[in-house]
């Protein structure tokens, strides 16, 4: 059976009685074949990341110095709100993309970003900051999730790890550069409004690129579904209920559920770094410029190293990169507590970034390995629900522990959780990607 005949048999749109030659040719999957749209989506994702980077150097200090938030748990409330909203939005973003098309969800996400910098600039109370982070969480959940899924759609199974490495490189390098820029601007002009003018430009450009230039990837999803079904001798239209996908991603499937817990702990670390590190460094009498550099080093290392780790997972597999990466993160956090001073903390921040880079794109690639194209968006949404709940869990846990026992104790507790997560991956997660098997296909 030829590809076009299989397409005609399995695609409802092709069952119209039209001759086989009249059926449009399916798009070709691959990074090289779709490099223009892939590069555009990387650029869009960079602007998505830059929106988060606006807050990483400045907002914890803003809460303490301008709004007089007395407790660390209160200061970290903006991270918890962001994480909770983003996690829930991730869940629906994948399902909405599967049902209504990826581009529509991407554009909608950018619309929620437009008011965010204005709310922070004009905020008379901390409640306005919380509202801004609710909108930012929706923006990130819709826009970043959809950009990830669209890249998975474009490249197909063989280069998925490299694709995720490139995607997260663009996003988190932008997070780092934005955090550095806002911190430097704040050190010269004040904590607001000047640092947040950048956000107005980021949101406007990201929206314009998404509306004008991004194309939907529905046909690429259909092409991969047909190819997988042809290889398996099954129907390409097989669907799985949301409840079933949620169960697989939460407890039933060892690969998907173990990836979900690792993602949650990974972002618990990131929530800690976002909300607590600037205050931890400030308490050690570091300058705002030094704090900006430290908040830059972690996501910058994370972003750059992902260029190698994503592709490396395509060659060596996913499991052990994830397990070792989680353990390295735990060791780096322990170093933050054991060491003191700008240079030792810089080394720990770099190590934390390397560990995160080993994990972050590899987890997404593992989800893509296991999930079928027809329910891939939903599976990514379930994974990102649990992963980004880590922001909320991390902010609450770190805030409560820091108020009760001090910031160093909070960081140490999270380091222990991270090491345990790496052990769980080593013991429970199966290998999801066997390069030699793909090469033989």
Residue positions per predicted region:
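Juxtamembrane intracellular "pre-TM" segments in multi-pass secondary transporters
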Residues: 15-35, 218-259, 441
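Helix-loop boundary and gating motifs at the non-cytosolic
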Residues: 32-83, 257-258, 262, 266-284
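Residue-level signature of mid-helix packing/kink "hotspots" within the transmembrane helices
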Residues: 83-91, 176, 299-307, 391-392
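Cytoplasmic helix-loop-helix junction between adjacent transmembrane helices
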Residues: 132-172, 366
């Amino acid at each position: 059976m030829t590809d076009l005949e299989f397409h005609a048999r399995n695609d409802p749109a092709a069952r119209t009685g039209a001759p086989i030659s009249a059926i449009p040719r399916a798009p070709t999957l691959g990074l090289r074949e779709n490099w223009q749209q892939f590069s555009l989506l990387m650029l869009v994702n960079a602007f998505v990341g830059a929106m988060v980077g606006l807050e990483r150097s400045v907002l914890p200090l803003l809460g303490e110095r301008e709004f007089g938030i007395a407790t660390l748990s209160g200061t970290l409330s903006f991270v918890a709100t962001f994480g909770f909203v983003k996690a829930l939005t991730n869940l629906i973003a994948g399902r909405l993309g599967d049902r209504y098309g990826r581009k529509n969800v991407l554009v909608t996400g950018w619309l929620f970003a437009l008011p965010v910098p204005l709310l922070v600039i004009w905020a008379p109370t901390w409640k306005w900051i919380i509202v801004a982070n609710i909108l930012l969480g929706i923006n990130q959940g819709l826009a970043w999730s959809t950009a990830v899924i669209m890249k998975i759609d474009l490249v197909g199974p063989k280069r998925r790890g490299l694709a995720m490495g490139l995607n997260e490189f663009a996003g988190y390098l932008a997070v780092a550069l934005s955090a550095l820029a806002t911190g430097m601007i704040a050190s010269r002009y004040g904590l607001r409004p000047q640092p947040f003018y950048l956000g107005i430009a980021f949101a406007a450009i990201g929206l314009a690129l998404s509306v004008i230039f991004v194309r939907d990837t529905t046909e690429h999803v259909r092409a991969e579904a047909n190819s997988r079904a042809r290889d398996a001798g099954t129907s390409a239209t097989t669907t799985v209920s949301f409840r079933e996908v949620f169960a697989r991603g939460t407890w039933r499937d060892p690969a998907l559920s173990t990836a979900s817990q690792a993602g949650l702990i990974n972002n618990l670390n990131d929530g800690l770094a976002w909300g607590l590190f600037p205050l931890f460094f400030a308490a050690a009498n570091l300058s705002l410029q030094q704090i900006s550099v430290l908040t830059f080093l972690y996501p910058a290392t994370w972003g750059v190293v992902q260029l190698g780790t994503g592709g490396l997972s395509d060659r060596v597999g996913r499991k052990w990169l994830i397990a070792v990466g989680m353990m390295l993160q735990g060791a780096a956090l322990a170093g933050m507590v054991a060491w003191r001073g700008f240079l030792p903390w810089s080394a720990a921040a770099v190590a934390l970034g390397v560990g995160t880079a080993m994990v972050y794109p590899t987890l997404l690639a593992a989800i893509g390995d296991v999930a079928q194209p027809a329910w891939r968006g939903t599976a990514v949404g379930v994974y990102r629900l649990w992963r980004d709940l880590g922001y909320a869990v991390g902010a609450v846990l770190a805030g409560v522990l820091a108020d009760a026992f001090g910031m160093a104790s909070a960081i140490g507790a999270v380091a222990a959780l991270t090491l345990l997560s790496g052990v769980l991956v080593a013991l429970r997660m199966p290998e999801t990607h066997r390069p030699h098997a793909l090469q033989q296909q």
